[in-house]
Structures are given as C-alpha cells and as structure tokens.
C-alpha cells in the first residue's frame, strides 16, 4: 500500500506534494511520486526522432524527481518516498496503471496554476481520473499552503440525497480511522438567475433562508437516525454563489473536504455531478473525492 502523487516538473507546483505528504501521514504509509510522460505513436521510419524523444523523456523524469526531492527533503521527514517514471500514450491511464500496480490507497493530484477565479482548475488528465479512478482522488487548490502536516478535521459535503447518507457514513469511518473530528456541511447557494429581477432581492433571500432551514432539518435527521454521533458538527452555509459560500464555511488549517459520488458503469468509479464539480472548483481546501 502507498499514496501515489502525480508530478511533472514545472507543471503544477509543490501544492500536490504538500497534500500527498499529509495524506501519507494520515494513512501511515509510504509515498510514491509518479511521473508519466506521454508516449507518441510509434513510427518506424522516424528512429532518430524516437531516440530524441526517449532522451527528452528521461531528462524530464529526472528533472521531475530532482524537483520533487527538493521539496520533499524538508516535508517528508519519516516517510518512505520512492519515484516511478514511465511513458504512456495517456497520462491518466499511466497514473492508473501505477495506482493498480502498487495497490495505492489514494491518488493525489495538483491543480493547474492558472485557475483565474476558480481555486481548482481541472485539466483533461485530472478530469479523466476523477471519472475513472477506482481509489479516492485528493486534489489540491492552486497555490495551496498548509501550516500543519497533519489532518485537523474532515468535512463531509452532504447533498441531502439518499446516496449521500452512505457518504456520511463512509466519512465517519475515515474520521475515526484518522483520529480527527468530523463536520457534515451542506450549501444553500443563490444562483445568478434564481428569480427574475422584478421579484426582488428580499424574496430571493426569503427563499434561500427557507432552503437553509430545510437543509438544517435534513442534517439533524442524520443525528436523530444515528448516522452521526453527537460530537459531529452539522452546518449549513449560505452564499451568493458557490465562491462566496465556500469562503464562508469557516475552514481550519489542515482540513480536508470529502465528497461522495455516484457509481458509473458496471464497477465502482468516480462520477461527478454538477454539485460536486462546483464545490471542487471553488474549495479553498483540498478535496477528497470518494469513488461511487
């Protein structure tokens, strides 16, 4: 068992490594830094190009390992770290090969640095992994920094659906395993076109508060039905849009937000709905996406 983090020199920065170290400490296991270099389609007549590509691939892998080692030297004290490099026609498939080969518990990804307003900008590789990974995927916001190397609290995103009750239970088991407190959080968000302008902001605010009140009742049922214990914090956060709502959630340094997903296909895989996707995009803390 190990934690796998995808890393390529100069691409996503050290945020993914910071998170990967914390996840490895949470699981009390080793860390594997995986560099996947895209392999082009074989062309027998271009032997010299193939040789140049192989050289470039080896140099990129070596540069990625050196860069990761520079960051991890001061971060990963007491953690066994190994480095894997392979060429693959698909970066996402290459990472999944490493995950399956090493029986990884979690796959850690970074966010593109140019996320504009969004804190997490998911590229095509991360998007495919979030929809196909057989293990939980942890993704970090761009330029994320944490001042503790431990997990301080696990928040569970609750969408008030029948499937999300099971997610709360799974998060409860994780919180117990990690030895940290748990919070169950849901969001009541005013959209841009919630109502036409003539309705007025007061009416919108009233409807939003009604939604929030209903969400509080649904959260309290989790406690009444024994899904969560008395020490679990239940919280509804409102906001004018997802960015404001996520900012208002009173995050702790060292906190992680866990989201559940729906099964997709014949086997358990991550399948993100719009609710989860918006939370991932604007979350100021790392997000742990659990397979369906």
From Swiss-Prot:
InterPro entries: Universal_stress_UspA, USP_A, UspA. It comes from the Bacteria. PANTHER family: UNIVERSAL STRESS PROTEIN SLR1230 (PTHR43010), USPA DOMAIN-CONTAINING PROTEIN (PTHR43010:SF1). Belongs to the universal stress protein A family. Was identified as a high-confidence drug target. This is Universal stress protein Rv2319c. It comes from Mycobacterium tuberculosis (strain ATCC 25618 / H37Rv). The lineage of its organism: Bacteria, Bacillati, Actinomycetota, Actinomycetes, Mycobacteriales.
